[in-house]
Every structure is written in structure tokens, then in C-alpha cells.
């Protein structure tokens, strides 16, 4: 009897040659590093060097997060990933009334160039690749990073990293949007153009399925809705007059890795194949780098449990293995205590050690795409591709990703799947170790990391000092220039950078744009 995958597709008890009858390896696979990139985007993949170990971190003040980053670097991390607090993600300063109670809680508070300078103090920005998980205010945070690099004497052409900058998934699954979709897409196109000219090695967007998966999307939904968003971004940039090969090589993606190894490996392989064909056939991309779906992976936080949290170490190791077998370019392995609170120093170190064991104590880096030709994985890859393309066609029938978002299509599909998962967990049909099976009579005590509530007052004091010391007329003039650019067609990042250089805050920059573009209010808001 066939078992159902997370995407509702059959997994047979036994597979043989009949599962791949008529299957053409030249068409479906190709060679690693060659179209359609099913086997990976680079010919040697991990046989030359392992993936980038990019641990996501940030909490409290810039000084506290800086200490964590330097600790991670000392422990062997090969890339940084910045977590910002909710006020920063929403474009509010730490002393804004709406920010009360949230400053520094789920990430680091960054209000101005002063904070960004402290955040990367003692970290040479030409020697580290930095990912910033920031969306609606991605442009000002990137510009703050560039300003700090200039202070270090590092040219923008030497900076490497990624901004998430994917606002469409915020409307679908997460909610940290600021502006309506149309001006949000304009800001993203401006960022593409700015980075091509100013920061050419920077990945301008990380088109994200991770958050959809955490909200309940199946693997097929995750890649379908992510790639549909990617198509919308490409269309936006092309409509703004950019050649596809001028920006597409800097596009990147972000996916989840669950414990269901076979389906996850198939998911990553199917996503690469679909994207390569879309870019070549729909957009006429000629540069091979424009066809490559390069992606970062984070292990599935939604699968971690507060009960028996040490079991999460096992879950994360399995999830990380799935990401590696699927050909990820970089990986964050969650800390075992993240279902309870922000990671402690110890749990963050163990999370990094998990990746290091995978890279250096197993043989998964010895050969490229070890599942190639597997009856089950190739069958599942084809099935997932077909399911994802069918969902992408439904998005297209609704008028594309933005129109489908406005109609609530993606959100509704994800919510239905999330409800199914919850029902299966509640009934015991879906086994969760330590939650509905193999429970302890009494949970062992665990002391989590606690963020100092006094951080909010300290950030407010820093802001007060900043506002008292800076040249207020220069700030006002720079913000006025930003608004003028937003009202017209000029690239807003140039006046935005000058405003931030004059020590305007992130909140002031975002408020200036709110005055011109307005704020998004979802149609299903209560």
C-alpha cells in the first residue's frame, strides 16, 4: 500500500525500472553544473569545498549580536546571517510607540548607521559573506552596510552577501510588509539596478519558500509559490527596462529542509529544473548563471518541539542531511532550543557542529548528487515537478503572483494544508516524538536565553543622542530628496543612501516613503 508524501503524492513500498519507463536521463538530468541543473548548479558541488555554513543570529543590541558573530566566526562559521528585531523589520525606530515590548527580542535592533557600525565592529566586511534577513526595509539596511564598509575602507565591489528583499511572501505567509505591492516591487527593481552598478557581487534578493513552509505549505506548494514569486520579480525588472541577464545571475532562493529526506531531495532537484526552463523558455536568458537556482536552506523550525528539546538535535541533523543531499549552496541548522527561546551560546555552537560533522565526518561530500538515477528519488522529482507546475499554472490563470495574492489564493492553499497537518498531529496519525508519542511524565527543566528588557531604554537613549548631535537641516533636506525621487521615477536608493549617511534613522527613511507610497492594509484584516 502506497504511503502519501507531504505533498499528497504516492510513495510506493518498492520501486524498480518500471517507475522510470520512458525516462530520458539526458533530458531530465544532464550533467552537474549543466542545464537543466537537476544534479546541482556547479560541476564539482561539495567535492571541492563544502557548502557555506551560515548560522542565523541576532538579538538585543548591536554590541551583543556582534559578540555572538565573532564567537561564531571563532567556532568556524563561514558566513554570517543577521536576524533583525520586529521593529526594524517593520521600518520602525526602537523608540516608536508601536515598537514597545519588541525591541531586540527576535533579532538585533538597528536604527541607524551608528548601530550598523557597532554590529560589524572588528569584522572586516571584505572577508565575510553576510546575509541579511530583511524584506520591506531591505534597501536602507543594505545601504547602512555599504556605508560601514566605506568607513572600513572596503569598496562596494568587494562586498558579498544577500538581502532577502522578498516582500511578496510577506503578503502570503509572514506579514512584515510596509508598502503596497506596486511600490514594493518598484523598490525591489530599484535595488536590482543599484546593486548592478554599485555592489555587483551582492545577491539582490532571496526569493523565499521557507516562511510559506513554516506557515504550513507542502513541498509542492513551497516551490510552486516561491517560483511564481520569482517570475513576478523577473517580469518587474524586465518591465523596468533591465535585460534579464543583467540581474538574474544575482537572484537567489531560500527553502526549508524537513525531516522527510526523500521528498526534500526531490523538491530541491525539481525546483532547479523548473527554474532553469522558465528562465530559458519564458525570459530568453542566455547567461548560464541566469538559469541557475542557487539557494540557501534553513532546517524546519516548525518541526522542532518544546517538549524534550534535546530530541531536536536529531531532527536538525536529519534536516541538514536532506539539504546537503539536495544540493544547497548554504545552510543554517537550527539550535535545539529554538522552540523555546533564542539560542544560547551552547546551543548555537552545537548547531554549527552539526554541519561540521556532516561536512567532515560523513561521505556526503565525496560525490555529486548521490541520489541521481535512484528509482524513488527520480520518480518523486518528476512527480513534484508536475505538481508544482500545475500550481504555478493556477497562479498564472489568476493573473500572476500579485493578482493571486490579492485574491488570497496562495494563503488559502497554505492554510488548508496547515489545518490538515494540525488535524493529523492531534489525532496521532502524524507521529511527533515527545508530543503525541513517547512522552515523558515530567519534562526536564531547561533554562533558555533571556533578552534583557532594559535594551529598549538603551536603544531609546542612543536615538536621543543621535538626534541631538546630527545636522537636522541636512537630514530634512536628504529626506525631502528621497520623497521627491519616490514621487517620480528616479532610483530611490541614491537619495536614501545620502539620508542614511546624514544619520537619518531607518524609521525616518521608511516614514518618508510611507508618506508617498502609503501603507499596505490586507483585505482580510479584522
Predicted segments, located by residue:
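Conserved strand-to-helix beginnings and helix N-cap segments that scaffold or border functional pockets
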Residues: 66, 142-143, 220, 265-269, ...
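Flexible, glycine-rich loop/tail regions that form catalytic "lids" or insertion modules at the edges
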Residues: 3-22, 31-37, 86, 344-345, ...
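Generic, well-ordered alpha-helical scaffold segments in large soluble proteins
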Residues: 59, 68-75, 113-123, 144-148, ...
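Short acidic (Asp/Glu) and glycine-rich catalytic loops that position anionic groups and cofactors
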Residues: 49, 95-98, 168-170, 206-209, ...
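Phosphate/diphosphate-binding loops
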Residues: 111, 129, 134-137, 149-151, ...
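Short beta-alpha connecting loops at secondary-structure transitions
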Residues: 101-105, 169-179, 212-217, 255-260, ...
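Flexible glycine/proline-rich, aromatic-decorated loop/lid segments
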Residues: 243-247, 285-299, 307-334, 343-368, ...
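Catalytic alpha/beta active-site cores
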Residues: 1-258, 263-264, 282, 289-296, ...
